[in-house]
């Protein structure tokens, strides 16, 4: 009969099983990658997540309501105001994704970005987009009411590395035919760089609770383990002494 595993080995086995049970989150991606669009724009939302073999069923939520589509990609052929809002998705082997916001604007221009919150050091790409891709020229990007960059022909504005100074309100303006048009103002926020060491060391509450419970069990189990080992050694020693005493008594006779 084999010996029982010591407490540390048992803890390692249970911990490995717990990690294997963790389910990854699905991820919603926009294609094109812009978080704001104009009415009648074409947008595709793609759900990245794990699927069971042969089953690509995907659940889509829009503002908390379940959509009828169960395809991995959800397409909006001509965006309307009511298409704006929060989108989430889930696959068979992935948990519910974090929300992605889509804004649908009415007007001639919209200032587009992949998102509105950036970390220091990240690149920022801004695009001045016209309704139905009408030709746009003499384009100016403005930050906090001041001209930031001018393009005679429409072009994206690239900021290679974001700093706190890039936080603020932005809009763009230009000419369509001979008409001056402007986008609505948007707010871009640049936050301090994320600390990967700190963020990776923060555990979800259920893992913290698991570690606390396993620590208590380990302490109790370890005490019991060594207590049994001590009693076993004492019992073996007493048995040897008894055998030796009996043997000596027999020789005296």
UniProtKB/Swiss-Prot annotation:
Residue intervals passing through the bilayer: 208-226
Signal peptide (UniProt feature, chain positions): 1-20
Disulfide bond annotation, renumbered to this chain: 47-89, 128-172
Example of a GO MF term: IgG binding
Cited SMART domains: IG, IGc2
Keyword Protease appears in the UniProt entry: no
Keyword Repeat: yes
Ranges facing Cytoplasmic side: 227-253
GO biological process terms, semicolon-separated: antibody-dependent cellular cytotoxicity
Superkingdom of origin organism: Eukaryota
Listed Gene3D superfamilies: Immunoglobulins
Extracellular side: 21-207
Glycosylated residues, chain numbering: 56, 63, 165, 180
Keywords: Cell membrane, Disulfide bond, Glycoprotein, IgG-binding protein, Immunity, Immunoglobulin domain, Membrane, Receptor, Repeat, Signal, Transmembrane, Transmembrane helix
Membrane topology qualifier: Single-pass membrane protein
Free-text function comment from the UniProt entry: Receptor for the invariable Fc fragment of immunoglobulin gamma (IgG). Optimally activated upon binding of clustered antigen-IgG complexes displayed on cell surfaces, triggers lysis of antibody-coated cells, a process known as antibody-dependent cellular cytotoxicity (ADCC). Does not bind free monomeric IgG, thus avoiding inappropriate effector cell activation in the absence of antigenic trigger. Mediates IgG effector functions on natural killer (NK) cells.
Quaternary structure and interacting proteins, as annotated: Forms a heterooligomeric complex with ITAM-containing signaling subunits FCER1G. Interacts (via transmembrane domain) with signaling subunits; this interaction is a prerequisite for receptor complex expression on the cell surface and intracellular signal transduction. Binds the Fc region of antigen-complexed IgG.
Protein's name according to its UniProt entry: Low affinity immunoglobulin gamma Fc region receptor III-B
């Amino acid at each position: 009969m084999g010996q029982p595993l010591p407490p540390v080995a048992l803890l390692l086995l249970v911990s490995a099983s717990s990690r294997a049970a963790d389910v990854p989150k699905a991820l919603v991606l926009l294609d094109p990658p812009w978080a704001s669009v104009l009415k009648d724009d074409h947008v595709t939302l793609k759900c990245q997540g794990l699927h069971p073999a042969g089953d690509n069923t995907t659940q889509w939520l829009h503002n908390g309501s379940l959509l009828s589509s169960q395809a991995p990609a959800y397409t909006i052929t001509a965006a309307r105001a009511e298409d704006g809002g929060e989108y989430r998705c889930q696959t068979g082997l992935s948990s519910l994704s974090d929300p992605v916001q889509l804004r649908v604007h009415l007007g001639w221009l919209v200032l587009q970005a992949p998102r509105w919150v950036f970390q220091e050091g990240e690149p920022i790409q801004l695009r001045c987009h016209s309704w139905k891709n009408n030709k746009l020229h003499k384009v100016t990007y403005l930050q906090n009411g001041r001209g930031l960059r001018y393009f005679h022909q429409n072009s994206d504005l690239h900021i290679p590395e974001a700093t706190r100074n890039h936080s603020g309100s932005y809009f763009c303006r230009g000419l369509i035919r001979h008409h001056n048009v402007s986008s609505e103002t948007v707010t871009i926020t640049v936050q301090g760089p994320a600390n990967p060491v700190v963020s990776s060391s923060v555990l979800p509450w259920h893992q913290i609770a698991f570690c606390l419970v396993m620590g208590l069990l380990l302490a109790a189990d370890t005490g019991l383990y060594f207590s049994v080992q001590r009693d076993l050694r004492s019992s073996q020693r007493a048995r040897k002494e008894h055998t030796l005493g009996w043997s000596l008594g027999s020789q005296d006779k």
